[in-house]
């Protein structure tokens, strides 16, 4: 049993003992009173001369009958009582009121409720603050990592070799500082791990704890600030005091943006609780008092909101980017996680890594776990490649919703919609390859076409972005061609949103609009209130941007319409196949449209000799520029 359990049992036993003690002292036996009678009954017994003696204390009368039994009663203001007792030969003993009960016992009984409340309050205060002092609000919540249990080391971290190298140097410094001090080097005071969610920042911190033979404290950024003023600053001071007592040591602060946001005019004024906490942290990290041997490692996925004073050298000397892994990194991560499950020889980490571009380490771990769950659900003894593919589809496209009963009309419309996406994607060489097309409802969609790039992409050119817009618009175009303009549904709303986002990014951020030019009109980083702020642009420029976005989307729409109109027979073939099979892989779609067997594994490159390329209508563009100039003079010089 842990210390907290023993403490609760001890307090419970003490509470029960005091209650029992109180009841015993209140019981009749301890006070010599066994039978309460009415005053009228008492007078009757006196007159019948059945009472031997009485003891009077104030208005309380306790007596003994001739047969040895005891009794008690309460006397009203009755002046003739003594005369009546003496006339009936009753022995009378008068006891002073203040000596009836032991002084300490009386004090205990009278103050028992108050003492009980104080005891309960002290108990809960100790439990809330880890068994420390009753007023332990300002105590740090940093937890010292226990040596018990399995350790995570750098061998368990894969796919982020650069970050591991930077942090390995810090671990080596803590193990053998003289190696670096010989050359005059100083240990870094802090390292900030920056990266999107799921890339392994916290896992790296756990690996450092497993590698470094020094005390390792961990705390969350949200653990500092509470409702009481001054608590956060006090906890920061106490945390660094803990670090000094255990130096050399490492303190890991997860999600530091919860306390390290840049200072400004907040809701509580410029001196609010969070800012006091941040100010104290700045002083402790690099103030007048040195904290030699205390290394701060923090993690965040929002470096843009952190205060600049926190990021300067001397506080966080190193900022280590932890990005999503490339194909080699994904393969290494998959191998680490595959060690934890049973799988057969069909599972190839390289193939899975190639089909999961953009996946973070956490997503890859989830994919492997989902595959194991799928295999267990099917009663298999080992995970095979089919389970991995099914898990990938579940992660990418969502859970299959077989409970939705689609009518034949809806199924046919969905088949043409998804067939339009797939067909235009095949005829756009710059578009990402088709991974799978399905009309089985998954997630929030009735059907979808999943595209995956063959390699990791870190940027996109104009042709790729315009091809993506055309693929987005192809579903709506297919509905319009097959069912007519009045039968177009709202199912393309998410496609329109995706196309609009790409087109607006081309115009406002990437400088890919000939009309607007290479000028940035996107949003800046968050302001002091945490809101997105944007550059100051005129109303006329905003209209130009909207016109360019519309032109790019319309261009993609017309391009998709041209492809689908020209290859209408293939659209019918693909839609009918989707209605029959419900799900087709990218290779099956190519086989289908090339006249091969659907499940042929023969290498089959779809004939791109008839592929289309988006061409900008220069004449139309110049006409738009001219008309805009006529409408808004002096906008573009």
Swiss-Prot record:
Binds 1 zinc ion per subunit. Pfam families: AAA, AAA_lid_3, FtsH_ext, Peptidase_M41. One of its GO terms (cellular component) is plasma membrane. Keywords: ATP-binding, Cell inner membrane, Cell membrane, Hydrolase, Membrane, Metal-binding, Metalloprotease, Nucleotide-binding, Protease, Transmembrane, Transmembrane helix, Zinc. One of its GO terms (molecular function) is zinc ion binding. Its EC number is 3.4.24.-. Its main location: membrane. One of its GO terms (biological process) is proteolysis. Acts as a processive, ATP-dependent zinc metallopeptidase for both cytoplasmic and membrane proteins. Plays a role in the quality control of integral membrane proteins. This is ATP-dependent zinc metalloprotease FtsH. The lineage of its organism: Bacteria, Pseudomonadati, Pseudomonadota, Alphaproteobacteria, Rickettsiales.
